[in-house]
């Protein structure tokens, strides 16, 4: 999971990652390990996410480590951030969440295995909808 965004672009931040994590845990138990890889300025914020934060000796993963993690993930869910674009371009399965800041079409992020959910307001996008799309990919 990549639940973070630039501090000056909080409009890109979906607030229901912990709800999604609960849905994943309730349905799949320990079948999938839910992790996040915070950037350097996101390490403290990662403590608020109910997922394992992957770090390299207390520091953010470098771009090579991050790309490897994404490429080897079963599924990625991300805000419209750098890791989402990496996921799309390395062929990872996943979803990226877009509010009104831009469209998936404008940034050319959608691929065969990587799709977007576009809504007017990310605050109104419920975890159940994201979870439903996620489970469709995994089944």
What is the meaning of each model-derived region?
Residues 1-9:
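Conserved donor-binding/catalytic core segment of Leloir-type glycosyltransferases
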Residues 3, 36, 119:
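Short glycine-centered, acidic/aromatic-flanked micro-motifs in structured strand/loop junctions
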Residues 9, 58, 119-122:
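Pocket-edge positions in alpha/beta enzyme catalytic cores
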Residues 10-11, 43, 124:
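Loop/helix-junction capping segments adjacent to catalytic residues or to phosphate/diphosphate-binding pockets
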Residues 11-13, 47-48, 107:
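Short, well-ordered secondary-structure micro-motifs
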Residues 16-95, 99-102:
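Donor-binding and catalytic core of enzymes assembling or modifying cell-surface/extracellular glycoconjugates
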Residues 85-139:
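Nucleotide-sugar donor-binding patch of glycosyltransferase catalytic domains
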